[in-house]
């Protein structure tokens, strides 16, 4: 499945919630009708079956983290092999992706921009360049912006935006040095309550 390159607001309207695909910190529901699906018949919201609800939740989470279907299924399989709650394990794996950590630290305005920074070799982990967006960051890893990339205006703009967002407690960031420490794997209480991972587990358990 190819990566979606169309309008970002359309995806948020499809899922009925802000997927944080745009760089602004203001909720996008002020500029588009999130409760109304895109398209000519978007106002007619059909009642979803249990399967439909589960599928929509999976699509929502997959789009939030910018992960393709096959990748997402592989994350789920890995989550089932780990000890503990499968749904929480899934979210932990997604949060540990390098592109997501770069976004959470504020070096990229969106996850898509952060993914591009990683692929363009602008990010280092423990002093070594890593250009794989799905690289799993471990506790105590140091993630930093490469020296020659620090002058990029988009990084400075992203850091300014990040100042307006709630700071993740599982990260320690030095905005001046443009580096941060992944102190620990986030707990479920640290993450968005708008995600219902249990629906995803139910979907894949069938």
Swiss-Prot record:
Record's GO cellular component terms: small ribosomal subunit
InterPro entries documented for this protein: Ribosomal_uS4, Ribosomal_uS4_bac-type, Ribosomal_uS4_CS, Ribosomal_uS4_N, S4_RNA-bd, S4_RNA-bd_sf
GO biological process: ribosomal small subunit biogenesis; translation
One GO MF term: rRNA binding
Protein name: Small ribosomal subunit protein uS4
HAMAP family named among the record's database cross-references: Ribosomal_uS4_B
Similarity annotation: Belongs to the universal ribosomal protein uS4 family.
């Amino acid at each position: 499945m190819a990566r979606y390159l169309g309008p970002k607001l359309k995806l948020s309207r499809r899922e009925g919630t802000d997927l944080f695909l745009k760089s602004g910190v203001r909720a996008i529901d002020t500029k588009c009708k999130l409760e109304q699906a895109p398209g000519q018949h978007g106002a007619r919201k059909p009642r979803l079956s249990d399967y439909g609800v589960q599928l929509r939740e999976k699509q929502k989470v997959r789009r939030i983290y910018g992960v393709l279907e096959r990748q997402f299924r592989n994350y789920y399989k890995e989550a089932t092999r780990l000890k503990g709650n499968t749904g929480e394990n899934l979210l932990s794996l997604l949060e540990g992706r390098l592109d997501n950590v770069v976004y959470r630290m504020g070096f990229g305005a969106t996850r898509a921009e952060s993914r591009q920074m990683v692929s363009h070799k602008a990010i280092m982990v423990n002093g070594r360049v890593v250009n794989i967006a799905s690289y799993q960051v471990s506790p105590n890893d140091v993630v930093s912006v490469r020296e020659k990339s620090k002058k990029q205006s988009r990084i400075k703009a992203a850091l300014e935006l990040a100042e307006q967002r709630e700071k993740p407690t599982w990260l320690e960031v030095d905005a001046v040095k443009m580096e941060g420490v992944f102190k620990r794997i986030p707990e479920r209480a640290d993450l968005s309550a708008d995600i219902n991972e249990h629906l995803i587990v139910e979907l894949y358990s069938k």
